[in-house]
């Protein structure tokens, strides 16, 4: 009998969560899924995901992504190496940059990378009435209609630079991050979702604690902090946007 993949914790304090989101426009929901399903998702990301890459080096550069199987070829692998070096240069000059491992749930679903596989089922769960109902209740946004998403792994030396997520015209209303890394993540290992004020000070930071769901209204200035070379594991997550169209 297959293991359940995505079951919400039935004891979530929905009214309290909605109050906090209305107050600050961001929150972290701990123990959002049942322990069993969160562990199953973590195993899928750690052991059953064909990881590609996502890279951008400068605000004027276009995001670059590559599927895992393409990275086995010499020419694309060399291009990835050069683009990673470019992200160092961009970040050093105070320009926007990011690099991390990625698997697009939406592209995989539409292009039938693994039809009926766990990643397809996960995207369906993210758009099912149970999850979308929780999201509408917590955010106070009854017009949310769908969720997109991708799996991400911020491994050693990966980061996401400060930016806004200002794609309001595309229907982005709320960003979400479902954290699925190891249980005892340590602060020195980075990978925090942080929010900045206008002076560049950090207002709030969320540890990527296992089985927690970060939600924040967009646009807000935020980043994912650098994961250092001594981090023992990657920061696994499912991320995306809740949309009104």
Q: Where is each model-derived feature located?
A:
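Fe(II)/2-oxoglutarate oxygenase catalytic core
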Residues: 1-214, 219-245
């Amino acid at each position: 009998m297959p293991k359940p993949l995505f079951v919400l914790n039935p004891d979530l304090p929905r009214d309290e969560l909605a109050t906090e989101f209305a107050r600050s426009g961001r929150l972290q929901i701990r123990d959002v899924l049942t322990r069993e399903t969160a562990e199953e998702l973590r195993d899928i990301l750690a052991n059953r995901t064909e990881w590609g890459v996502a890279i951008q080096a400068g605000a004027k550069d276009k995001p670059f992504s590559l599927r895992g199987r393409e990275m086995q070829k010499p020419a694309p692998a060399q291009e990835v190496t050069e683009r990673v070096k470019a992200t160092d240069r961009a970040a050093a000059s105070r320009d926007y940059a990011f690099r991390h491992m990625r698997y697009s749930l939406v592209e995989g679903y539409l292009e039938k990378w693994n039809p009926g596989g766990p990643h397809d089922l996960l995207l369906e769960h993210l758009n099912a009435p149970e999850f979308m109902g929780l999201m509408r209740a917590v955010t106070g946004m009854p017009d949310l209609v769908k969720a997109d998403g991708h799996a991400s792994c911020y491994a050693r030396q990966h980061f996401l630079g400060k930016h806004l997520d200002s794609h309001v015209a595309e229907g982005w209303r709320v960003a979400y991050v479902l954290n699925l890394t190891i249980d005892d993540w340590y602060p020195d290992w980075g990978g925090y979702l942080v929010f900045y004020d206008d002076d560049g000070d950090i207002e709030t930071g969320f540890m990527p604690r296992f089985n927690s769901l970060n939600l924040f209204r967009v646009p807000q200035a935020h980043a994912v902090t650098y994961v250092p070379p001594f981090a023992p594991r990657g920061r696994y997550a499912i991320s995306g946007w809740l949309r009104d169209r």
